[in-house]
Swiss-Prot record:
Family matches, as InterPro entries: Ribosomal_bL27, Ribosomal_bL27_CS
Name recorded for this polypeptide: Large ribosomal subunit protein bL27
NCBIfam families: L27
Gene Ontology CC annotations of this record: cytosolic large ribosomal subunit
Top-level taxon of origin: Bacteria
Alphabetic keyword roster: Ribonucleoprotein, Ribosomal protein
Leader sequence residues: none
Keyword Metal-binding listed: no
UniProt-listed SUPFAM superfamilies: Ribosomal L27 protein-like
Region (Disordered): 1-20
Family, similarity comment: Belongs to the bacterial ribosomal protein bL27 family.
Coiled coil: none
Organism: Paraburkholderia phymatum (strain DSM 17167 / CIP 108236 / LMG 21445 / STM815)
Length: 86
């Protein structure tokens, strides 16, 4: 018998590419206007003073300065602020 049975097929072997989410500039670090501070899915962190939000919920600096993370309210909402450079 010189025959070989067909091998079974597998439904595994795929994985999605990582999206590189998270904090890009930490508290106290300097940032330029337009610089990305946080990449996120949904508003885990909310924009504060001198911070804008993109259509994919990315937080970015509107002015040059230093990043400052704070919490606000009873639910402890995470806010991201940029303190302008003097």
């Amino acid at each position: 018998m010189a025959h070989k049975k067909a091998g079974g097929s597998s439904r595994n072997g795929r994985d999605s590419e990582s999206k590189r989410l998270g904090v890009k500039v930490y508290g106290g670090q300097a940032i330029l206007a337009g610089g990305i501070i946080v990449r996120q899915r949904g508003t885990r962190m909310h924009p504060g003073e001198n911070v804008g939000i993109g259509k994919d919920h990315t937080l970015f600096a509107l002015t040059d300065g230093h990043v400052k993370f704070t919490t606000k309210g009873a639910g402890k909402k995470h806010m991201v602020n940029v303190v302008p450079a003097v």
